[in-house]
């Protein structure tokens, strides 16, 4: 049986542009694609932290070092410049691989520069003001 597992996550990126009249996709700084082990054309889910919108699209490589997170096409009606988003990609794997698989988790700053990377999907980097995803609030 194949299991669908989270393989890559860029957490709390800031949308830098949105263009309704584009053919679709999300443009992502190539440095972020590399850090998250994402390829151009790869399916990603986008979760908008500000308004709760969820959508799926594919990645396009943006200029390396630019910090670009560009929402293109119809998704620009849901996600806007300045919104915080999470980009998530999933992979399918057999049980044995899934049990030992370590995803690529990337946290960025307000300019979409990498501040930490790891493999723990519940991690909340020190000083981020976030809570770990596997602990009750207040602990």
From Swiss-Prot:
Gene label: panD
GO biological process, one term: alanine biosynthetic process
Subcellular location: Cytoplasm
Assembly notes: Heterooctamer of four alpha and four beta subunits.
Protein known as: Aspartate 1-decarboxylase
UniProt KW keywords: Autocatalytic cleavage, Cytoplasm, Decarboxylase, Lyase, Pantothenate biosynthesis, Pyruvate, Schiff base, Zymogen
Matches recorded under Gene3D superfamilies: 2.40.40.20
Cofactor(s) for this UniProt protein: pyruvate
């Amino acid at each position: 049986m194949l299991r669908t597992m989270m393989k890559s996550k860029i957490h709390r990126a800031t949308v830098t542009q949105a263009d309704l009249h584009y053919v679709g996709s999300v443009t992502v700084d190539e440095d972020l694609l590399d850090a998250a082990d994402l390829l151009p054309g790869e399916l990603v889910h986008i979760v908008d932290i500000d308004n709760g919108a969820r959508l799926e699209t594919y990645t396009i490589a943006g200029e390396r070092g630019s910090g670009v997170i560009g929402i293109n096409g119809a998704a620009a009606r849901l996600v806007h410049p300045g919104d915080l988003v999470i980009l998530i990609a999933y992979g399918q794997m057999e049980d044995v691989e899934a049990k030992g698989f370590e995803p690529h988790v990337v946290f960025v700053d307000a300019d979409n520069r990498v501040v930490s990377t790891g493999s723990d999907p519940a991690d909340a980097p020190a000083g981020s003001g976030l809570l770990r995803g596997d602990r009750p609030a207040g602990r």
